[in-house]
Amino acid sequence: SWAAPYQASIAHVGGSPNALSQVRNGNYRDIDQFFNDGSYWRSRDRYAPHNVYTSGEKLDQLNSAKGYNNSEFTSFARADGKPVESPNATSVNINLSGSLYNTSYAYDKASNSYLRSMAGAPHTDREDGQITPNTVVAMEVGVEARAQNYDGYEDVKTTGSGKAYIFQNGTVATATWSKADINSPLKLTDESGKDVALNRGQTWIAAFTPGRGSVSWQ
């Protein structure tokens, strides 16, 4: 749902029954590993099922073969951010589904970015080191049980609106997230309804359900 407005290709290896039915309904650019095995591989130095890899080159070739060459979308407003003199949010904690997935961010003024940790340890990319987004967004979202909840899954409510917290430049701002329907872009607006400009570079977004998860900072 969040990827739909970007006309993005969805690269995945299987998924929940509901997610698969949505991705395969013809409204998405589905590049499932199950049907495009030559564009993915399994590494022997990691445990299955978390050992499937691909590459930008292979996905570019696959997209080109399928005619997925261009996308039209409305992006977030962007700005050239710089650290504030008196930061008020240099440590951010986002509690999600449990201790193995809870994340924290430590603000680094020198790079004006946030050093990400997960499960109490630095969250690293094997190639590039610790993940350091320029902006972190935490959104309050609801969940709902399936009408036919035979598989035990719940759906995150990706449309509608709710509260959001935007961390950048060492500060936090309260905003409203909104998404009118599945094909509409996700919007982040301030109390006057104006789009909030996000720093250029990486933005990491976390969605949590109040009562089950939380966000805090200091």
Predicted regions located by residue number:
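A surface/extracellular/periplasmic glyco- and lipid-processing/surface-interacting theme
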Residues: 1-218
